[in-house]
Amino acid sequence: MKVICEKTKSPLVISIPHSGTDIPQDIDSLCNLAAKREHTDWALQELVTPLSETTLVATVSRYIVDVNRFKPRTGKATQPIIPRIDEKGNLLFNNYPSKQKQVNWLERYYTPYYLHLENLLNEKLEHHKRVLLVDLHSYDDKLFNTSDIILGTRKKQTLSPATLEQLQILFHEEGLTTQVDTPFSGGNIIATFGKQARIEAVQIEVPYSL
């Protein structure tokens, strides 16, 4: 992972969990070269860099470890976090990682992302009464009946009505239309941090065509 503009004065932290393209060498040998990885969130780093806001970026591909997925509540399976197939149904791995490898990958990539994000948010809370976490994504609007900006709030559990309205106004002033929680309501990142005191969180999905 990497951080862009770690020290800023604003109460905003941006998370980009799905732009990573790295496949570590020890993992690459397990991968199926024929698999597609089309739903990487392209160009988001270029979008946020001019904003000069504190941003955490996952550098490892979401097709290796998806840091926005929920851990299973029971059992030890990590399939939701370490996917098995691509969008076309192709196996992502010639040899799906053993349980021990799965645990190791989560320790290397999943847990550190949350710890680092928590540290960035706590640092902001030392200087601000409230902090906003934006979990930034992009989506292929050819696959959905919309090209709106999607604001995910976990059914309005992670974001106050006032902040949601402010965000909608900001996008509308730029000529952009928005939808709330449809078709994306947000993943584990906003679910984890959006329920914490003094932190609001929103998942923002930007269409590829924008």
Q: Model regions: which residues?
A:
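N-terminal catalytic or cofactor-binding beta/alpha core of small enzyme domains
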Residues: 1-133, 138-210
